[in-house]
Amino acid sequence: MKKRKNKKNSKAAEKALKVTINGKEETVYEQETPETEANKSMTFSNWEEKRQAEQEVAASQEHPDEDEFNWDSEEDKVFKEDPKVVPPFQKKKTKLYAKGKTGAAKPVKRVAATIAFAAVIGTGLGLFALNISGNKEASAPASLEDSLGSQTAKAGDTSADKQTSGAEKQAAQTEGTYKTYAVQAGKFSNEKGAETLTEQLTEKGYSAVSLSKDDGYTYVIAGLASEKEVSQQLGQVLIDSDFEAWGGKELSLSIESDMTDSFKETAELAAKAILDEDITKASVEKIEKSLGETKASETGEKKAILQALKELEDPSAEAGWKAQQELLAVVK
């Protein structure tokens, strides 16, 4: 036999809800879910377990879409335009041309430093070479003009190429000063070195004389010529014989005014003989005749010129150097 369900028990398990539809009132019963009934019948031993269970139930009933955050573009716009909002700091970019300028300056500094270093090294090596060269010091191209000067012989203008006017030459001759070009064979800090070189030159058949000056140096003069180019040619003859020589040095000599022409012409003939140029006997006799007409005594410049002309009566390179040696006696 089937037992009938107890309506009271079934109704008690349902919730009554009155609803009015089209003017008619009806009662609707909502049956509780098993889960609800299970929750109602759940018991807890302490408050901590109850609180934890409630949190788990609340978490399971949360809508999954609530985790997502919807950005409102309008609010974002207001945020950007709000003057109270301070924008984040951004580091300024450095200009590229500044780096390029710095980089371009470095090579210039390196080149300048290299040049300065080379100049210092070169100067040091030059001083070292001068110290080990002994007493002998090679003269610079302008050393003779800058240094030679005394009552007997003195340097002319520092520029060998400078030409004096006719009036200046006439005044110099009136004062007894004769300007010519010399061949410098050496410059020494003591007389002994100059005398040694002078002996070496004369032993080889060349002309030479030492001349001490007030600057503390002693110079070796190896020849005279009235023209600069001729003096340079005489210097080349010595260079070809393994001697050091510099021609074209302007030199002033103290000679009597009435003897300057004869001295000049005799020096020209001696240079021609050394360079193997033709010398006529008539040219030698002409100078001797002009000397005989002068009132100068047979000493000093006149004696030196006459002895030089005697050597040139039989012209040759050897005779030319001997004539030069006689003329160089005037330098002292």
UniProtKB/Swiss-Prot annotation:
Residues 175-250 form the SPOR domain. Residues 1-10 have a biased composition (Basic residues). Keywords: Cell membrane, Membrane, Sporulation, Transmembrane, Transmembrane helix. The chain crosses the membrane at residues 112-132. Residues 11-27 have a biased composition (Basic and acidic residues). Induction: Transcription is under sporulation control. This is Stage II sporulation protein B. The gene is spoIIB.
